[in-house]
Amino acid sequence: MCLTGVDYFSTLGYQPGIAFLAAGALAPIATVILVLLTLFGALPVYSKVAAASPDGQGSISMLEDLLPRWRGKALVLVLLGFAATDFIITITLSAADATEHIIHNPFVPHMFDHPVGVTIVLLAALGAVFIKGFKEAIGIAVVIVAIYLALNVFLIGHGLLEIFRHPEYVPRWTNALYTQHGNPVMMLALALLVFPKLALGLSGFETGVAVMPLVAGDRVRNTRKMLRSAALIMSVALIGSSVVTTLLIPPAAFAEGGEASGRALAYLAHHYHGELFGTIYDISTIAILWFAGASAMAGLLNLVPRYLPRYGMAPEWTRATRPLVTLFTAITFLITVIFKANVAAQGGAYATGVLVLMTSAAVAVTLALWRASSRSWIPFGVITLIFGYTTVTNVIERPDGVKIAAWFIVTIVVTSLISRVLRSTELRVLGVTADPLAQSFLQEVAHSPIRIIANRPDSGLFDEYAHKLREAQETHHLPPNTRVLFVEVRPSDASAFSEVLNVAGADIGGHHVLRCASPAIPNAIAALLLFIRDETKQIPHAYFGWTEGNPIVYLLKFLAFGEGDTAPVTREVLRQAEHDPELRPRIHIG
């Protein structure tokens, strides 16, 4: 909960100020609407997501299952772009906001007045913590969140007590409401219009699901408990902070350059409790803002290795933690330099990433319930519409968020496709298994030259194999009565990258056939030839016919659909998989 909370709870550092700038005196009412959306929208949705995806892949995994083949993977790449926007900007924005608290503290020397440099130091320190390991990150998160929440409970509680002691604050606030907005209906309508600007207060749910693999015991039940606890704590804190800051802080102090700008609760800490407590609160806020990136980093480290390497769209080293942490830290450096560590410039992209992921989660849950013929899809459909409205409103008002997300999406898609092309001639097989009949075929030919004829599956009747055998004997000058094995690979989901090759034997009128299915036919044949070599301790010879057609067209067909000019690609896969030519299965084309 604390690893999720450093992201979720840290928004208290700037959320009250954003709420007042967006809604003015309506800020507490708009915050109540946000809390209702949290408790009755986001929380039910992510409780369903946690049950459907206990490995931490979240709503993205659910949508991947709902859409087959390349369509599902294309959607995943787009959503990964928004997830990257959310998580990376969480890291950079929080560190930049921590920097703002540092350089504007009266006790900090002016030599630190370099936002980009200070932010990069904070990001490097965060990366170093994760390179050391998850356990250390969780331990630090627990300490930071416990102290920060304790200080906020005291600060908000004292603020409410101050309002109780001075009841004139309440009529002053209600008079401002009626003066500006006339009647309660108009107040509610305006609050519904402005509450999407407060969407940063929803930031912890996707991260909460993403870190599920770190939850011990009954993972789904405990994750739901974690999300529920975090949501309830944050709901109370959001409403309390909005009330005390709106009623106790002069409106002019919220303006840009004002004493409460970007640090409303810190303003109250200094104003009511003196510089010592105020500085302690500043240090706690700086710590949680800096470490807010920890939960985002955990989410990235969980998402990326589960998708891109499996799609063949990233090198295998991206499954390891330390290289990924180094890569993500370098990206955060770049983003910080591009945006000059400006918090406001990154805010739109942050909210856009959060809302798109939440909307996709609501869509995934609604579709899953609808497919299961459960009538509960109707309330989740309503939640989806509300999240959709919130997202569209945010995009219209802050289009820069979509632009930044588009940059992430294009970068992920382009680099993923390049990686897929570069890795297309890898073996792409996780293992080979053969049924008893296939094993018996291999045992029969183990003590004689092993000749394999590649056959494109057709009718599966005796005449097909008799014709193919005669053709191979004429083309390759095979001796009469030569014992051969036929190999057939049926194309499966071409969008998949690697899987276990399950080989089944078939006896068609005395012709022995080895059959399997694979997303990439040449790679499967290469893997099967290496398997035959290892099982029989002999070098197999495989016989192919030349393919009629343009080789460039067949190359593109292989990249997209896993089949094309089979023989030369099979030979290239074997060349990369087995570096010793003497041990490499032989390929014959005629």
Question: Can you say where each PLM-predicted feature lies in the sequence?
Answer:
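Membrane-interface "cap" regions at the ends of multi-pass membrane proteins
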Residues: 1-14, 63-65, 69-77, 185-191
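Extracellular loop-to-transmembrane helix junctions
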Residues: 19-65, 71-76, 92-122, 147, ...
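Loop-to-transmembrane helix boundary motifs in multi-pass membrane proteins
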Residues: 69-73, 112-121, 214-240, 305-340, ...
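Membrane-interface loop-to-helix entry segments
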Residues: 131-162, 228, 295, 348-361, ...
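Helix-loop-helix junctions that connect adjacent transmembrane segments
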Residues: 146, 153-203, 396, 400
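Extracellular/periplasmic helix-exit of transmembrane alpha-helices
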Residues: 157-170, 224-265
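A generic transmembrane alpha-helix motif of multi-pass inner-membrane proteins
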Residues: 347, 364-456
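Cytosolic C-terminal regulatory domains/tails of membrane transporters and channels
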Residues: 427-590
